[in-house]
Amino acid sequence: MKRQAFSLLSRLNPWQQLLLSAVLVTLAAPAAAQLRAPGTRTQGIFTQQGSQSASQGSTVAPSQPMMGVPQPSSQPRSQLVDEVVAVVNNSVITRRELLDRADEIESQLRAAKREVPPRPDLLGEVLERLVMERVQTQAAQEAGIKVTDQEVDRAIESVAQQNKMSATELRSRVEASGMSWTKYRDELRKQVQVIRLREREVDSKVQVYDGEIDNYLAARNGGQAAASGPTEFNVAQILVRVPEDASDAQKAQLKTKAEGLLKQVQGGADFAELAKANSEAPEASQGGSLGFREIGRLPAVFANAVVDLQPGAVVPEVLESANGFHVVKLVSKRTAAAQPAASDRIAQTQVRHILIRTGPNMPEAEAKRQMATIRDRITHGVDFADAARRYSQDGSASQGGELGWVSPGELVPEFEQAMNRLRPGEISDPVVTQFGVHLIQVENRRETEVSPEKQRDFARAEVREQKLRAAYDDWVRQLRSAAYVEYRINRQR
């Protein structure tokens, strides 16, 4: 199973997706990630299938930080008078930050020959994204999460690899864009901090049970694809947030406010406009819409209230949650496209490698230099297996570096991506992962039957990923709802 970065992207239109991802590329997986697939436990660089409890723990690689190569700014703003456009808890977002980010997104849209949205819409989306980033970064910092310089170095190396350049070339591009190298590293460090927080607060709490795997396989492998997919609900909300330390009198006052909004909706007022003007939820600028979701991906308090409603109906009473009071509407619902039956064959790669581990006594640059020398010797006649036995620091060294036949999704992304670019017999350039520096050789490729055990492994990974996406959405929403955010400009202008 490929490892997808779960996010809110599935709810956004194409230009909003580019707003969040732009020229983003995947970085090195956190050190806790395994070389092998979800649901396995490590034995050196090799792994074996673990028990259910192992697969429910922290062995699944979390979604990874994203960072792109900054583009040169056509209009430096060093002489602009800056001002605060939003306050997020105890920090601020400035107009310069907002305009710089919006310009970058607009530049990427134009470069991709994509339609550029109206400037007010773009600025509103960018500002909300900056708020969401700031809220998550603050939560990570308050949790005391630290990211080492070595982790940042590893992430930078991966960015460079993904953009087919060296770390030195990446630095030149960054500085040419007008961003200092220190700033770039700081931004990357913040992203890794957020990933660490999510590992602790979201990833580690998601479990997958055998019954869920059975249901998934029954739906996917029932002989034929289902005639139709699951029902999806497009729910919108207006949130009246209640502070954690609110008194009973304050709660009563805020509930009265929510009930007043409900009466306006029941009286024919436009729900989306009321949400834009009154909701304190992150999706307020989209009229309160959460986008289409299966019932299991909705907050439980919403799911129970809307499951039997007709499209266009409003829940007849104000709902209460830990975040406050909600006015909820079922905007529409639809039947999702059917999932195709799972293939009973997969492509596998026979691969071997040489590993030099990096650490305090082996800097990454030196490991790459040594690996380049080893590669040169192999290309001039030294046997790969002999070189692996002599130089590799992996448990596979005694077997000539053999990892055997591997399936898609079984290896960390940097390794698998480099492997997939090779033809049988070819040898990679040095490849950096969290384990160190690798030299990879593809020996052969084949298609093979998927065993029942492997199907369950894949199903477990897919079910877990679906649950992670839902849990992540809810986690981000709770962080945003609990934050103090004051807009100093109208997000709709």
Curated annotation (Swiss-Prot):
HAMAP family noted in UniProt: Chaperone_SurA (MF_01183)
Protein name, as recorded: Chaperone SurA
EC id: 5.2.1.8
Biased composition (Low complexity): 48-58
Keywords: Chaperone, Isomerase, Periplasm, Repeat, Rotamase, Signal
Domain topic, free-text comment: The PPIase activity resides only in the second parvulin domain. The N-terminal region and the C-terminal tail are necessary and sufficient for the chaperone activity of SurA. The PPIase activity is dispensable for SurA to function as a chaperone. The N-terminal region and the C-terminal tail are also required for porin recognition.
Organismal lineage: Bacteria, Pseudomonadati, Pseudomonadota, Betaproteobacteria, Burkholderiales
Species assigned in the record: Cupriavidus metallidurans (strain ATCC 43123 / DSM 2839 / NBRC 102507 / CH34)
Domain of life: Bacteria
Compartments in which it is found: Periplasm
A molecular function (GO) term: peptidyl-prolyl cis-trans isomerase activity
Enzyme class, spelled out: isomerase
GO CC annotation terms, alphabetical: outer membrane-bounded periplasmic space
Region of interest called Disordered, as start-end residue ranges on this chain: 46-76
Annotated signal sequence range: 1-33
General function of this protein: Chaperone involved in the correct folding and assembly of outer membrane proteins. Recognizes specific patterns of aromatic residues and the orientation of their side chains, which are found more frequently in integral outer membrane proteins. May act in both early periplasmic and late outer membrane-associated steps of protein maturation.
Main location: periplasm
Pfam families the UniProt entry points to: Rotamase, Rotamase_3, SurA_N
Domain PpiC: 230-332, 346-444
